[in-house]
Structure formats: C-alpha cells, structure tokens
A protein has these predicted regions:
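Divalent-metal coordination cores built from histidine and acidic residues
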Residues: 2-24, 28-29, 78-79, 83-84, ...
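Histidine-rich, glycine-flanked metal-binding segment
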Residues: 4-32, 38-85
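Hydrophobic alpha-helical bundles that form the membrane domains of multi-pass transporters
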Residues: 26, 33, 54, 94, ...
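Divalent metal-coordination and catalytic microenvironments
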Residues: 37, 53, 58, 81, ...
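Di-metal (Zn2+ and/or Mg2+/Mn2+) metal-binding site signature of metallo-dependent hydrolases
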Residues: 82-104
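Hydrophobic alpha-helical scaffolding
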Residues: 95, 122-126, 162-163, 223-226, ...
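Active-site environment of divalent metal-dependent phosphoester hydrolases
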Residues: 96-98, 124-127, 156-158, 192-194, ...
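Active-site core of metal-dependent hydrolases
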Residues: 193-258
C-alpha cells in the first residue's frame, strides 16, 4: 500500500493500480478477505450469495464466490449474517452550510452507509480562496474514511458587483483540476445572466471557469432555479450545464427532466 493514497496523484494511482491488478490475479498477497452472506451487484440488480471481498491496502482487489480467490490472504474475517453493498454517496452537498468540519460530517454519515460526498464549496471558498481544497482534504489526510470530492464554486465571488476573500476564474479552476484528482468539476453555475448575457460583467469570468473545466475533462454542475420556459431549459443544457438540483415547484420537477 502507498501510505499517502488518501489523497492521490496520477503517479501514485498508477503505482496502486499496478499492484492491485497483481493482487486481483492472486500473484501478490492480499491484506484482508471479508466473507459475507450476500453481496449486491448494483448494475445487475441482483443479490449474489456467499461472496468474498479481497482487500489490498484501502482498495478492493477481488470479488467472487466464497473460497474462489486463488491468492494468499494475510487475514480473513467472516460475517455470514451480513450483506455487503457499495457505499452510498451524495453527488451534491454543502457540508460548509452545516457549520461542521469534515471529520464531524464523517462521524454522522458513515454509520449510515455514506462513504463519499461531492462538496459544492462556494460559501467557504469566498473566505479561504485558493486554499479551499486544503481545508477539505485535511481530515482525509489525517485518516478520515469519508471521501470528499471537491467542486470549486462558480460563485466566487457571487456576482461581478461583489468582492470576497476569493476569486475563481479560468486560471484558478484549471489549476484546481490539474493539481488534484479529488477535484471533479465546477460547482453549481447559478448566476444564469452571467452565462447567457455577453454584456454581463461576470460573463468572461464564468465562461473562463467553464472553459477550464471542459479543457480538463471535468463536469459542469448547474443550478437552474426558476427555469420553466422551454427556451431557458434548452439554453441551460446547450451551455453544457449537466445537472440541476434546485427545483422548487412541481412544474419544474416535471418540466426540467423532459
């Protein structure tokens, strides 16, 4: 196991994968095997009975019928009365809005099966600026099992008429995505006029962040509260905004997915 794989680089990820595949083949020893009564195959919508999960470091290397793994294992534990399912996750959350630090968030959600969260950080980003990722990673580096995938906020500052403790534009967003694999994209683009109106003073900054995200193959998350006209909804999608979690009215919940 590479000791610093809680926050990984592309270089470390390659080294981890190179060893992991050998463990999966039984050519290198595994650290742990967990035997369970059944395991949920999510994509097949099917329960598989009497399975074993083989672990190397912090990664799953092998899953198969009980006793099928052909390699050596340092330790085996058996829980025939339990079922195993992949960890639940939250694709959009503001831990910052709870006033909890990441380790306290982990203590609340991990016992309920939540193993990862996409932190949509714009509130705290307006305070700590480009050091935002450092804050979210600190608990993870200290050993917290909760994975936090960071999405720098598009609203830093919230509008062109405001100033804050941070400024994110093309350069900042590209550096976030280039330097850190835990950064997955751009957080909720919510200043809709700065997306569609070239005369809006926030237009260049917003599209700079979107461009940087596209260049680094990230995901651009949307925030389209109040968009009910089909022209606006179509324009929202045409801009490359891939999601919308902000639905306030029943007609929005029905019209937006259509």
């Amino acid at each position: 196991m590479i000791e610093d794989d809680l926050i990984i680089s592309a270089h470390d990820e390659v080294a981890i994968r190179q060893r992991l595949l050998l463990v999966a083949m039984g050519r290198e020893p595994a650290d742990l095997a967990i035997e369970v009564g059944r395991l949920l195959a999510v994509h097949a919508n099917h329960w598989m009975e009497n399975q074993e999960i083989v672990i190397s470091g912090r990664r799953i290397a092998y899953v198969g019928p009980l006793g099928s793994y052909r390699g050596t294992v340092a330790k085996r534990v058996s829980y025939p009365q339990l079922s195993a399912v992949p960890g639940f996750g939250e694709v959009h959350k503001h831990i910052e809005s709870t006033h909890l630090t990441p380790e306290y968030e982990a203590a609340l959600v991990l016992p309920r099966g939540n193993t990862w969260t996409c932190e949509a950080s714009h509130e705290f980003a307006n305070v700590d600026g480009t050091r935002n990722t450092e804050f979210w990673q600190k608990a993870r580096l200290a050993g917290s099992p909760l994975k936090i995938f960071i999405q720098p906020g598009s609203a830093v500052p919230p509008s062109a008429w405001e100033e804050s403790g941070g400024y994110y534009g093309y350069d900042e967003q590209k550096q976030f995505l280039r330097d850190d694999l835990s950064v997955t994209g751009l957080d909720e683009v919510m200043d809709w006029p700065s997306v569609w109106d070239p005369d809006n003073p926030g237009y260049a900054r917003m599209w700079g962040m979107i461009r940087a995200t596209f260049e680094m193959r990230g995901v651009v998350e949307g925030h389209g509260s109040g968009l009910v006209d089909p022209h606006d909804i179509s324009a929202f999608a045409a801009a490359g905004l891939s999601s919308d979690h902000e639905v306030w009215a029943l007609d929005e919940a029905w019209d937006d997915p259509k």
